[in-house]
Amino acid sequence: MNKTNKKDWMLAIAFVVLAAVLIHCASIIMRPVHNSYGSTWDAYLCEPEDSIDVLFLGSSYAYCDWNPEIMFAASGLTGYVMAGSEQTPSITYWYLKQALKTQSPQVVVMEGSSFFFEMYQNYTQINLDYMPRGIDRARAILDAAEPDKRLGLFFDLYFYHDRWKELTREDIAKLITPASADVNKGYTYVDNVYDTKGSTPYRREPSKDTAAYEKHLEAFKKIAELCRDKGIDLIVTINPTFSQCSPEIYDKLEKDLTGIAPEADFMLLADSFDEIGLDISRDLYDGGHLNFYGACKFSEWTGKMLLDKGYSPREQTKENAAAWDDGAQYWLNLRDNAQSAAS
């Protein structure tokens, strides 16, 4: 290769690298800020490595119902909710695989309402787009995304190129402002109170797509195998909810899941309001989810339940322990002030 050809190749490579960097920067700017309602990967990756005791997975039933800071206040156990809106088990598997690159929890707690979802739900784009870039994200797109969304997920300017009129200083600042851990730990605060006066829990119909259910079970098998390989315990819950499936459907789900992973602990809590101490006239956000007050009670109950099962808090650095104490106090103050205002 003569000097001219070599120079041309070097210029071409430099151009490609520069173009890739510019496209990456543009993608960061154009992609909307996302720090609630699941898929909070930036904050998760800022947690100190191997500092999380409990990893919560699932859909909005997970990130609305569990507040890890409140659980910490009640039990000393640290946790994070790495969930996503209407997240299917196939995506949950890839979330778990990615999450375990920086954390080694004692137990994974998966909220299992997603086993009743369709093959694809409404928030695939958000669930996958905010995953860290890498081979697992690419494999997740091919495995769990609708075919017509894959192009935009691989090249997200396809989705967001027309956002330039909506850009804010916060969008631009993402390029130079590093992400940080926060007090939410994947939890999303919702405070609406669902009116249940004179009513009782109503029936929820799961998807009738048997192919979707089989795919969800295949994903669960991979989740269970990954937990087994890593020496992590696995609990599947159906969280307290006013929209409940029939006992027969829950029985079938338990049989199917424990048939795949006999070591997994299945906890049907859909109608366990009294056991947990929930007030259905105050603690529900809507027909499906708990509100902030309900999440506080359920998170305290979850922490104590996990202690009873033999899990114990791991040792934390002085700095991280102080951060958890401060975060817990923030949420406890918010709860206490809200209760005082309501009384």
List each language-model region with its residue ranges:
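Hydrophobic membrane-insertion alpha-helices, especially the h-region
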Residues: 10-28
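Alpha-helical transmembrane signal-anchor/signal-peptide segments
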Residues: 29-50
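Loop/turn elements at helix/coil->beta-strand transitions in domains of secreted/extracellular proteins
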Residues: 51-53, 77-78, 103-107, 228-235, ...
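Membrane-embedded segments
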Residues: 57, 61-144
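Secreted/periplasmic serine-hydrolase-like ester/acetyl group-modifying domain
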Residues: 125-232, 314-343
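Flexible, glycine-rich surface segments
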Residues: 194-280
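C-terminal regions of proteins
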Residues: 251, 255-326, 330-342
